[in-house]
Curated annotation (Swiss-Prot):
<dbReference type="GO" id="GO:0009037">
    <property type="term" value="F:tyrosine-based site-specific recombinase activity"/>
</dbReference>
<feature type="active site" description="O-(3'-phospho-DNA)-tyrosine intermediate">
    <location>
        <position position="272"/>
    </location>
</feature>
<keyword id="KW-0229">DNA integration</keyword>
<dbReference type="InterPro" id="IPR023009">
    <property type="entry name" value="Tyrosine_recombinase_XerC/XerD"/>
</dbReference>
<dbReference type="GO" id="GO:0006313">
    <property type="term" value="P:DNA transposition"/>
</dbReference>
<feature type="active site">
    <location>
        <position position="263"/>
    </location>
</feature>
<dbReference type="GO" id="GO:0006310">
    <property type="term" value="P:DNA recombination"/>
</dbReference>
<feature type="active site">
    <location>
        <position position="237"/>
    </location>
</feature>
<keyword id="KW-0131">Cell cycle</keyword>
<dbReference type="InterPro" id="IPR011010">
    <property type="entry name" value="DNA_brk_join_enz"/>
</dbReference>
<feature type="domain" description="Tyr recombinase">
    <location>
        <begin position="106"/>
        <end position="285"/>
    </location>
</feature>
<dbReference type="Pfam" id="PF00589">
    <property type="entry name" value="Phage_integrase"/>
</dbReference>
<comment type="function">
    <text>Site-specific tyrosine recombinase, which acts by catalyzing the cutting and rejoining of the recombining DNA molecules. The XerC-XerD complex is essential to convert dimers of the bacterial chromosome into monomers to permit their segregation at cell division. It also contributes to the segregational stability of plasmids.</text>
</comment>
<dbReference type="Pfam" id="PF02899">
    <property type="entry name" value="Phage_int_SAM_1"/>
</dbReference>
<dbReference type="InterPro" id="IPR002104">
    <property type="entry name" value="Integrase_catalytic"/>
</dbReference>
<keyword id="KW-0132">Cell division</keyword>
<feature type="active site">
    <location>
        <position position="170"/>
    </location>
</feature>
Length: 303
């Protein structure tokens, strides 16, 4: 088996001319499979079937290998077997159709409601930068905008009288969103100052030069506000996640949250139900008299 593996690696080096880094990756991954196969008493690559390979992958996953690493390992294994099939050294590919175990989806980070209010309720100086930053923070949290949507927002899409904003989201889809009272007030305080910069176009959020703020500039302003008010780094999407989580927590209306976020598939929105459950579980742990009851199920030493 080792001779076949070495021949494949030489094929990658001399004929495919892969980089040394890529070649080392193939070697490490395939040596893991070889070690497991030899430990199982297999004497050639034909003896490795899909069931055995799945068992090997599961074992590596239990040992702490990430899904990404295992996907790369399976890709290397498929490459080996395709080579062996072409060379007539093997009759099947046990990795065909096999996929790596999926990692649990990471929950988005959010602020709890009190922290969100702490961020937004700080004292605001009456100057260009402070008023602008307050308006964009309020709008992020009030309407759940994506960073790209806030960057691309023009005055003509803002209706403060009706408390509405239109944005162009993913897939060039336009949606209309409510603007809360606090966000309206922040925008009303910002827009008169905006004209001082002689804006080049209709962008709602601009710098002192009059140019539309870039995504990077907005990320920096949000991060600085987080450090100043909360002592932590924030990202614009964290405010969007907080908007969704708090709205779902209060309303329980998943479909409405989906529409407001502009998600094409409700499955994307369902991640926030896990956040909501975490909140409910936390409330239960803090408030229920028997939530943290000590002792075993049979009552310990009770008669």
């Amino acid at each position: 088996m080792r001779a076949d593996l070495d021949a494949f690696l030489e094929h990658l080096r001399s004929e495919r001319q892969v980089s040394a880094h890529t070649l080392d990756g193939y070697r490490r991954d395939l040596l893991k499979i070889l070690a497991l196969a030899e430990k199982a008493g297999l004497s050639d690559w034909n003896a490795l079937d899909t069931r055995s390979l799945r068992t090997f992958v599961a074992r590596l996953h239990q040992q702490g290998q990430s899904s990404r690493s295992l996907a790369r390992l399976l890709s290397a294994t498929r490459g080996l077997y395709q080579y062996l099939l072409r060379e007539g050294r093997c009759r099947h590919d046990p990795a065909n159709g096999l996929s790596a175990p999926k990692s649990p989806r990471k929950l988005p980070r959010t602020l709890d409601a009190d922290r969100a209010l702490q961020l937004l309720d700080g004292a605001v100086e009456d100057d260009f930068i402070a008023r602008r930053d307050q308006a964009l923070l309020e709008l992020f949290y009030s309407s759940g905008l994506r960073l790209s949507e806030l960057v691309g927002l023009d005055l003509e899409w803002l209706d403060l009288k009706e408390g509405l904003v239109r944005v162009r989201g993913k897939g060039n889809k336009v949606r209309e969103l409510p603007v809360g009272k606090a966000a309206r007030q922040a925008l009303e305080a910002w827009l008169p100052l905006r004209t001082q910069a002689a804006p080049e176009d209709g962008a709602v959020f601009i710098g002192r030069s009059g140019k539309r703020l870039t995504p990077r500039a907005i990320q920096l302003r949000v991060r600085q506000a987080g450090v100043r008010e909360l002592g932590q780094h924030l990202h614009p999407h964290m405010l969007r996640h907080s908007f969704a989580s708090h709205l779902l927590e209060s309303s329980g209306d998943l479909r409405a949250v989906q529409e407001l976020l502009g998600h094409a598939d409700i499955a994307t929105t369902q991640i926030y139900t896990h956040l909501d459950f975490q909140h409910l579980a936390s409330v239960y742990d803090r408030a229920h008299p028997r939530a943290k009851r000590k002792g075993n199920a049979d009552g310990g030493n009770d008669p």
